[in-house]
């Protein structure tokens, strides 16, 4: 464990030097000592001596101790020159000087290249399964135990466990022994905390923010201010850097001597039984510390640490008890993060809308290539920021992105290709953000996207093919996103999408073929989503589609035959959804369709030619669903079909001959519906068919029709026979 406390001898040196150089800052004095050392002058260098003895290397070109930070970088103005930046944490002063490369090389040689005094131990959870080993990933605190990938423990799990210990232990301090070995940690680890970090991010607590790693101390100081004003002595937070997670613990300690100490401890799951702690008697001193001051990795992890931690932004998400949730409201409103892809990714992930809105305005001034990179905002595992925002349910973030891009200030700033790349926000498997939102049943996110899409399409002049591709939300090997909605019976989500279509048709000029394709929602193999909805008895899905058709017809020319094709679309097995609904007895689906017949007649001019396919529901072998219902003893289905014909025959213009044609319709096996019922011994269904025919003959006045008389006599004669196997 590393503890940073003031050293009296070092403070004395600084004070003595400051007294002899009243008009120079300590940063300037430090630089003067470096120059003197480089030139070979035999002069005292107390600042350099103390720094060399107490500093550690935080990056390839970064050194620091409790008072100073030295950074080396390439000069922005002179590519052949180097720059040295000296930051004095106590005075809050910064000095930058252009130097020759040989000067940098000399200083790099005299400063310690790494800290060998730290007690570091890699987290190394070994497999108990000897027969099959899986690779362990040391970086990012990720390992497999007991040897299977599905049992992996990643850094966010360990960081969350550490926070639990902070609040659960009596002294608000985790017992480091619990983290000292793989065995002890696994004994201590609570598997319930595996989803805790994700839940914390999704809950969007007050005080969350994204800051430059160099401004980490500023955020800690802001938290200490709120803690003091609310009388709270301990709090914890999760730190997210790229896809790595750490834990920070803040503590205000009042000593018996009347002093107040402000303590910041950072625990990194990359190492065990170790944390770095900085203590100060002044909150103002805390704000000078960077996250790099708390990093404790050995040389083998140094490059990873530089690339993915200390040189990036950090998301800080307070983890407070429920009664303290509002304590940090407004505490970090003044924190301005750097404009970088890492920042944008974290802002979208944690739902920090205030900071994101400010950066979206700044993006308009950047070149398109950089602007696209910022808005796509991939992290190191190729997940775009917008995808993460959708994953965590940050509807306001999604709305900010889409609405900002819809403003005239962005018109012409992005090519259509780059814009679609940003909006689709695909993961590494090619699934878009819209696909994710609909799959997660996140109505708020989907509504935000669909509401903003018409204006965005108008601003950037997107054509109907681009909008259609966005709405279909599929990759080259996936099903249409609405296929999953219909198959799973998510009527509310389907209604949200269909309600947005009329405006999209009007503004984006979607064609009838594109709209009907969205409604059919086929999977990769061509099976329609509506087929599965009917097969599974999801009548709400059928109802939502039927209710949406009239409003869609006002925008595009949908015909009666189009609707019949939609309702009778076939699966790979060449059955229709209505065929399967009749076979399985899904009365709710059948009633929903037949109850909509008057509306279909009035709106789409349905006639008897359109009605008959719905009554019979043939499969590709011309075998009717009505006959399949008879075969499977679905008496209610048979009764409903004949009742629908009886109720609507006059409306649809059926004549006596049409009715008799329906009654005498034969399957490929040459049976009529009555004969099939009789053949299978379903006498009740056979009598139902006969009685319905008699009622319709009386109602329509064709009791003297020769076809009717002959059919009636034939059916009555069959019913009087003892054996069913006597059909003609």
UniProtKB/Swiss-Prot annotation:
The gene is arpA. ANK repeats lie at residues 381-410, 429-458, 477-506, 525-554, 573-602. Pfam families: Toxin_15. InterPro entries: Ankyrin_rpt, Ankyrin_rpt-contain_sf, Toxin_15_N. Keywords: ANK repeat, Repeat. Belongs to the Toxin_15 family. Disulfide bonds: none annotated. This is Ankyrin repeat protein A.
């Amino acid at each position: 464990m590393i503890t940073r406390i003031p050293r009296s001898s070092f403070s004395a040196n600084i004070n003595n030097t400051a007294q002899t150089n009243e008009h120079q800052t300590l940063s300037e004095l430090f630089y003067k000592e470096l120059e003197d050392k480089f030139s070979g002058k035999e002069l005292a260098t107390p600042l350099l001596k103390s720094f060399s003895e107490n500093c550690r290397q935080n990056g390839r070109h970064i050194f620091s101790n409790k008072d100073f930070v030295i950074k080396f970088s390439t000069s922005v103005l002179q590519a052949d020159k180097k720059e040295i930046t000296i930051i004095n944490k106590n005075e809050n002063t910064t000095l930058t000087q252009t130097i020759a490369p040989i000067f940098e090389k000399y200083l790099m040689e005299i400063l310690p290249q790494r800290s060998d005094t730290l007690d570091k131990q890699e987290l190394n959870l070994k497999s108990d399964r000897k027969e099959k080993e899986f690779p362990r990933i040391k970086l990012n605190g990720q390992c497999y135990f007991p040897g299977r990938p599905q049992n992996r423990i990643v850094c966010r799990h360990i960081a969350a466990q550490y926070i639990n210990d902070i609040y659960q232990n009596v002294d608000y301090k985790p017992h480091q022994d619990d983290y000292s070995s793989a065995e002890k940690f696994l004994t201590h680890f609570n598997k319930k905390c595996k989803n805790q970090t994700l839940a914390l991010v999704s809950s969007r607590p007050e005080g969350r923010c994204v800051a430059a790693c160099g401004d980490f101390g500023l955020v800690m100081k802001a938290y200490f201010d709120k803690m003091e004003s609310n009388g709270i002595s301990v709090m914890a937070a999760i730190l997210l850097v790229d896809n790595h997670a750490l834990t920070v613990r803040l503590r205000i300690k009042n000593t018996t001597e009347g002093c107040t100490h402000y303590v910041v401890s950072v625990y990194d799951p990359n190492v065990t039984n170790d944390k770095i702690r900085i203590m100060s008697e002044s909150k103002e001193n805390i704000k000078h510390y960077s996250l790099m001051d708390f990093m404790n990795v050995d040389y083998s992890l140094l490059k990873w640490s530089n690339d993915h931690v200390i040189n990036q932004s950090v998301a800080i998400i307070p983890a407070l008890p429920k009664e303290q949730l509002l304590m940090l409201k407004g505490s970090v409103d003044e924190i301005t993060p750097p404009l970088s892809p890492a920042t944008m990714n974290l802002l979208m992930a944690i739902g920090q809308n205030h900071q994101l809105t400010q950066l979206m305005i700044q993006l308009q001034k950047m070149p398109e290539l950089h602007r696209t990179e910022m808005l796509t905002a991939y992290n190191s595992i190729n997940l775009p920021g917008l995808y993460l925002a959708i994953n965590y349910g940050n509807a306001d973030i999604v709305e900010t992105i889409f609405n900002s891009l819809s403003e005239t200030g962005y018109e012409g700033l992005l090519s259509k290709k780059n814009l679609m790349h940003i909006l689709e926000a695909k993961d590494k498997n090619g699934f878009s953000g819209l696909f994710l939102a609909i799959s997660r049943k996140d109505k708020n996110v989907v509504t935000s996207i669909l509401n903003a899409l018409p204006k965005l399409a108008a601003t950037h002049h997107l054509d109907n093919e681009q909008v259609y591709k966005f709405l279909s939300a599929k990759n080259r090997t996936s099903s249409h996103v609405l296929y999953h909605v219909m198959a799973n019976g998510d009527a509310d989500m389907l209604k949200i999408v269909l309600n947005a279509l009329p405006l999209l048709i009007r503004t984006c000029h979607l064609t009838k073929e594109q709209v009907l394709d969205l409604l059919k929602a086929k999977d990769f193999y061509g099976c329609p989503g509506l087929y599965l909805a009917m097969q599974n008895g999801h009548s709400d899905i059928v109802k939502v589609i039927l209710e949406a058709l009239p409003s869609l017809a006002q925008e595009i020319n949908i015909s009666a035959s189009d609707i019949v094709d939609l309702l009778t679309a076939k699966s790979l097995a060449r059955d229709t959804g209505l065929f399967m609904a009749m076979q399985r007895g899904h009365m709710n689906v059948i009633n929903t369709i037949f109850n909509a017949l008057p509306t279909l007649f009035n709106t789409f001019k349905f006639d008897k030619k359109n009605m008959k396919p719905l009554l019979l529901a043939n499969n590709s072998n011309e075998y009717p669903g009505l006959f399949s219902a008879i075969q499977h003893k679905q008496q209610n289905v048979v009764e409903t079909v004949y009742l629908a014909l009886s109720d609507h025959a006059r409306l649809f213009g059926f004549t006596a001959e049409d009715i008799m044609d329906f009654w005498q319709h034969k399957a490929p096996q040459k049976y009529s519906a009555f004969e099939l019922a009789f053949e299978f011994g379903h006498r009740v269904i056979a009598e139902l068919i006969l009685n319905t025919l008699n009622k319709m003959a009386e109602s329509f006045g064709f009791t003297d029709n020769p076809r009717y008389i002959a059919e009636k006599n034939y059916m009555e004669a069959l019913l009087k026979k003892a054996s069913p196997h006597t059909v003609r």
